[in-house]
Amino acid sequence: FLGGLQDHVDGGFARYCVDENWSVPHFEKMLYDNAGLLSLAARTSVLAAEFARKSEGEIAQRAQNLAWLAQRSAQGIIDFLNEELLTASSAAPAFAASLDADSSRDGRQIEGAYYTFSREQIALVTDPLIQRLPKGLLRFAPVAEDPQNFCFSLLRVPETNEIGVLHELRDAMRTLRRSRIMPVRDEKVIAGWNGLAIEALSEAALLLDQPEALALAEKAATSVWTMQWDENAGRLARVSFANRAEHGNEGTLQDYAALALGFLALGQASGHKQWAERASRLLGRAADFVDPETGVPRDAVQADARIAAQRSNIAAVTVLDDALPASGALYAKALAMHALQSMAAGDYTEADAADLESARVLSAHALALASDAPTQVATALEVQCIVSSPVQYLALSQWDSAEAKRVRSVALSLGLNVRHDPSLPGAAQTVQIQPCREELCQMPVAGMDGLFSLFASGKGA
């Protein structure tokens, strides 16, 4: 959150850093990277803040700093998605795929030209603030492949009284950037990548109380559904470009699963049932991607003969996370989250139970690979936690009290669904929390302290 991977001026994150100090990035910004980091930052902000409440001294301060940094990074990603990746279409604005690393300077294409600053430009933005700029806070790291230019980041967490001048500096740097030629944007609207962003924005809207994030998620979701879903065929186009969907290029399993997850999260955040209904339709088609004989998910319903031959006629999707979550694991997660939402709503059916079992089977490889390659099975591990946890959702006696909102935020950060049940017994002044798994519920516990005690006992883990 401090280093050069993050764009501290306009928000958002680059793909990776090119130096051992994490001070200079490869400047390309991808939609899916920022979607994943938005979810991580929003959850980290909530959980770190709760940890700070329960801690003292230096540990509490470090947790509080992490919560602040994570919230700042999440807001930066929201701003980046809205200001730099949202397409200009008035009819169907959605998220473009990426921003290039290169842009023009003095007639030449240079990596990072839009983002970096020369010594003269650094002096231009810092000199008016020089008396108030704190020492040991700012870092201008030299860019090896672009001599005499520097990348801005932070060396430490700013003190409360330093934030104002830091914002002034950022505004000055932003104004300077606006005089430059922007990097080229890849205008393709990819269904699955937008689904990941919609899911992350919906989570952030709830966790950080960010209505603008929810509005942005709804805008993109409406556009992708309107533009890329073929109502007559019941098919999803993988890509649209300039308000035209390529309906001859059906989405992959990854597109169906990721967009379904986005719609499920959006329905939960907005309270609008249409999104869960649309997610169900996407999952209905996604089921056709599972080989009926082997039960193995495939990239496409009909295997490409050339690809199948290279794979010994097995057209399975990858089971390992890479730059993107594994398609099979995303599908398993979508099935599990759909089932959990049904549980919390009191509508759990045999079909939901079957979907939950399918999710368990599709993610079972994570248990064998976790010790050797945890990052490559992270999505599948998340699914295993969902399906095996003794607590899958919570019922709350209160909904809008300050403590109830805290419980809801912590629950969502941990992947738990929540429902309102005012009939729960207990003291009226304290929120009562009932942990449940499928259709079986435990005795309620009182307040946030009771919930943490439950988790500490292992009964909620």
Where are the regions that the model predicts?
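Glycan-recognition and catalytic cores of secretory/periplasmic carbohydrate-active enzymes
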Residues: 1-461
